[in-house]
Every structure is written in structure tokens, then in C-alpha cells.
Amino acid sequence: MSNILQSDIWARFQESNGHTVIRKSGNGWSYLAIVEGGATGRYLYSPYGPVASSAVAFDEALASLKEEAAKLRCLFVRIEPTESAIWGDQDAAAFLARRGAVLAPRQVQPSHTQIIDLSGSEDEIIKGMISGYRTRHRNIHKKGVTVEVSTNPSDMSILFGFLEETAERNGFNRQHDDYLMQAARVLMPAGAASLYIAKLAGENGESAPIAAAFVYDSDDTRTYAHAAASFEHRTLSAGVVVMTNLILDAKRKGLKYVDLFGIAPEDQPDHE
């Protein structure tokens, strides 16, 4: 399972934002790392990395990261390894602690997620959804809602409006428009991102957006990255239908997984 945050196109996107990006690889390991920070000090950050096939490979990658950080005069290295092959049967936290790692006070990427396996048929994937999602997916058209897909960066303004509305109502900080727009400008032409838009038909025959979701695609995985919906039309649950459509489209595209990119653990409903 590959991650967009460790891909060549993500490196290009980060470089377009003015970041220094380091890409290294060796026997069973690789990483993309970005120089972050400012006047108070810089650090080298490998989002969902390094990628490694074993503990030995991970140690080699970590040594390389430390070496690059020293060259760049970074204060520390921030890592987010995800492959269980790295620590095997060992406790992941203990494995990393023995290598001098300490848990960061704030998580940048989601620490919990849900992966949807797309190996089944479309019917099997739909059957695997909760009943309410299945019902909305099959019947939402009866209420005049359709879902479109855009690879035009200018359409990102639709999502921005919903994100701002949601952030103001719920009191959280969201990703800046400039950042997401630049992601769209770099990733969309490369086939690595798309915007799903739910529209509601009006009495005048024109359709207006009521929900949107921005997704990233790696070689085999679609990441459900940023999404929001109109509060006014919340009873339609258009965001659900946007999600079901982007999942099925990922299957049609030949991808193997959909990463929902951040869910609360079942025993921690208030997890952030």
C-alpha cells in the first residue's frame, strides 16, 4: 500500500511551495522528507515515513535521515513510520523509544484511520457499507442530487466555502486555501487528485453545490483528504454520497484501497 505523502508528485508539490525536499533510498527502505520550521529552528519531517521492509532497513533509513538533518542544520527529525514489518511482533512505541524517539506533543497526520479494501466487486463494496450509506447511495438521485468529478483547480473554491462554513460553526482550524489550491494545481494535472462535488437541482433547473471532497491518489490508494458539506442541506447527507461515489470510482480506476484519513477509535469518540 503506497502513500501519496511519500510520492514523487508530493515532492514536486512541496517544492512548489518553496520547501527543500530530500529523497533517499536504500536496500529495503526509502523516504521523502521536508525541511520545516522557521526562525525558531528547523527540523526534517518525513510524513508517514520512512518506508521500510524490516527493522534493519528502518535503522538504515533513520541513520540517513539523521545524517541529512545534520547537513541541513536541523534541530531534530520527525518521523511517522506506519509499516508493521518494521517492528514485527514488538510494541511499536517501545521499538521506536529504544532508538531515541519520543512521542510528539502534536500529531500532524491522523494517528488513526480506516482502510477500505477494494478487491471485491462493486456490489460487495456497497454491501460492506452501513445500511444508511447504502440507502442514500441508491436513492439520493430521487431528491435531485447528483455527483460530479472535477480536475479543474478553479473548482476548489466550492470546497473552500464549505470548509470555512464548517470551521466557523465547529470552531476548528482548517488547512489554508492557498495550500489546497496549490495542491490542486500540481496534483490534478498529474492525475493524482480530484474534486468530488454533490449538486442539488433547483426549481429553476439549475444545480448548486451542496458538498465537496478533495482526494489524493497514489499508485494504489485513494486518500479522502478534505471534505465538507452545506449545513443548510444537512438532512440530505450529501457528503455520504460523495464518499460512496469516490470509493467506487477508485475501484473503477484500478486502485486497491481507500484511506479515510482520520477516524476516532471506537473507544475514544472524542479523539483528536
Give names to the regions the model predicted.
Residues 1-41, 82-86, 97-108, 113-234, ...:
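A conserved beta-strand-loop-helix scaffold within acyl/acetyltransferase catalytic domains
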